[in-house]
A protein has these predicted regions:
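Structural signature of beta-strand start/N-cap positions in the alpha/beta core
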Residues: 12, 37-40, 64-67
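Glycine-rich, basic loop-to-helix element that forms the pyrophosphate-binding segment
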Residues: 71-87
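Short aromatic/hydrophobic "clamp" motif used to bind/position activated sugar donors
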Residues: 92
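Catalytic metal- and UDP-sugar-binding loop of GT-A-like glycosyltransferases, i.e.
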Residues: 71-72, 95-97
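Alpha/beta-hydrolase active-site loop signature
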Residues: 19, 48, 75
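Acidic helix N-cap motif at the loop->helix transition within catalytic regions
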Residues: 25, 39, 50-58
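A conserved acidic beta->alpha catalytic loop
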Residues: 30, 45-54
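N-proximal low-complexity "stem/linker" segments adjacent to membrane-targeting elements
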Residues: 1-32
């Protein structure tokens, strides 16, 4: 029987994205560059009207841990809930830019 330890447990990082293209790369890079690597990074594009959605897609092409969900704007809580529905991690972390 295998038990998850704190060093092997999957962590889901949910990042709602709405019109933050200027800060998005810094935010995502800070998560990617963490020493803990057993992560899934869920970028929820909440109907951005800037280039945020495209930036999210570019990140998903270079890192298989990154998943992107594009949705109609519903606000921060809705974006978080959509991310929660997708998340598979034992632990959940919400990150804002």
């Amino acid at each position: 029987m295998h038990q998850n330890t704190s060093e092997s447990a999957m962590v889901s990082v949910i990042i709602p994205v709405y019109n933050v293209q200027m800060y998005l790369a810094e935010c995502v890079d800070s998560v990617i560059n963490q020493t803990y690597k057993n992560l899934e990074i869920i970028l929820v594009d909440d109907g951005s009207t800037d280039e945020g959605g495209k930036i999210c897609d570019q990140y998903s092409e270079i890192d298989s841990r990154i998943h992107v969900i594009h949705k109609k704007n519903g606000g921060l809580s809705d974006a978080r809930n959509v991310g929660l529905d997708y998340a598979v991690g034992e632990y959940i972390f919400f990150r804002r830019q």
